[in-house]
Structures are given as C-alpha cells and as structure tokens.
Amino acid sequence: VNIVKYASMNVLISMPTLGSLKASNHSRIDAWPQIWNLRTIRLEATTGGQIRIRLKAEDIQAEARTSGILEIKGEAQNLQAILKTAARLEARELETQNADIQLSIGAKAEIQVNQRLTYDLYGHSRLVIKGNPQIENSHNYSGSRIIKEK
C-alpha cells in the first residue's frame, strides 16, 4: 500500500505474511498485537516514521534514520540494525541470539542479546544492552556510550 496524500487516517490491512515494512514522513505502522512468524523481514523507518511489530523471526534487517523509530518485540535469531541521525530502536523485549548494530549521529538502540554482539558506534550515539552476550569486533567513537543492564 502506498499512501501519498498527507492526511490523518487509519488503514487496516490483512495479509498472510510480511516481507518488509517501511514508514516515512511521520507515518506510523502498528503491526501488533498479532505475532508474525517469519523467516526474514526488513523494517525501515525514516523522517519521523514509526513501526511497532511483534514477531518470531530468523533474521531481522532494521534501518532507521532522521528520527525514525522501530519498536520490536518477540524473538529473533539474528538482528542487523543500522540507525542514523537521532533514530531509535526499542528492542528490549526482543529476545535476540545474535546482533550486529551500527549507530551514528545521536542514534539510540536498546537491545536484548544472549549470544553474540558486534557494534560500531559513532557521533554521540548510545547503545543499551540487556543480556550477557559475547562482544566481538566492536568500536566506540566520538563520545558514544554503552550501557549494560542486568
């Protein structure tokens, strides 16, 4: 569905499966309370767009930029996320085994990781980690912060 007119509206869509979701220009996609069982999904939120989803997935590719917000709950084997320019990833309630996170220019990610984590942080970004993953091949530059929660 491609809605291009700028108006406040609710659109209800029913579909058997998802491959990707994209929200932009302050739009919001709520894909719950349903739990989506997926092998792979791509999520993209830009320019204030917001996506909320609950899922069980093997692979999640997430991208947010320019104040985009991704809120993900459920379970995933692998999470790959790229966040730029004040984007946010709220995934404390996404139980993830492996994660690869790239943050820059004030982006913030809150994640739960159990096994392996790699990250690259630039430009005053912040990563909040829940869990006790093995951290591999990671970089922290330009005033970025890492916070470990118990």
Enumerate the predicted regions with their spans:
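Extended, compositionally simple hydrophobic/Ser/Thr-rich segments
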Residues: 3, 9-13, 18-150
